[in-house]
Amino acid sequence: MVECPGASVPEIVFAGRSNAGKSTAINTLCKQRQLAYASKMPGRTQLLNFFHVIEQAEPIARLVDLPGYGFAQLAQTSQSVWDKELGSYLAERPSLVGTVLIVDCRRGLLELDYALIKWVGHRQLPVHILLSKADKFNRQEQVLALRATQKALDPYRVNGHEITVQLWSALKKIGMVELETQLSNWVRPAVSTPDTPENEPPTS
């Protein structure tokens, strides 16, 4: 697995297709425009990027910006290496507490999105889906997109796998409170009952 910081605090990964808006979501959530570089060229983020969430001068969690998947301009070898590293991280990282999957509401869930949901489902990691660019839809279209996504996910809610969905717009700040609440629910139990010693060395 790629070199990562010690697994001493809960981590939440932000995943999705290239240019889905992962970096922008992290920037909006943290209220820092340039915290995670938001590129207009898909495939720009090619490494795992870790961002600490600080409370009272202490890190209580990390947000992890994963490289976008499925971008056609990436060389096949690069895509293979990415798949291997991502798979290793998702399968082995002990501090993972949840996955935020960002999906363009105008396109809906695609094949690679379903693959990721199944992938993290093997570890029973909760998935929270952001239907991004919701500001592009009127209210009726937003409701229909939300319902369609919920219905499409029913077959994946097996063995109690937690999958939740919300509307999201970084531009209009749609869904900010809902997202913050969801992430807090994931982090707080993990903070109160940590599975990993604070002094665990970095994984490489």
Language model features by range: what are they?
Residues 58, 85-162:
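Conserved C-terminal guanine-recognition region of P-loop GTPase G domains, centered on the G4
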Residues 20, 77, 81, 111, ...:
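Charged, alpha-helix-enriched surfaces in structured cytosolic catalytic cores
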Residues 33-34, 71-74, 110, 138-139, ...:
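Conserved protein kinase catalytic core
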Residues 51, 132, 179:
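Residue-level signal for inorganic ion chemistry
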Residues 3-6, 44-50, 61, 67-97, ...:
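Switch II of P-loop NTPase G domains
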Residues 1, 136-196:
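Canonical P-loop GTPase G-domain recognition
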Residues 65, 132, 169:
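Active-site glycine-centered loops adjacent to acidic/histidine catalytic or metal-binding residues
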Residues 1-73, 188, 193-204:
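Conserved G1/Walker A P-loop phosphate-binding module
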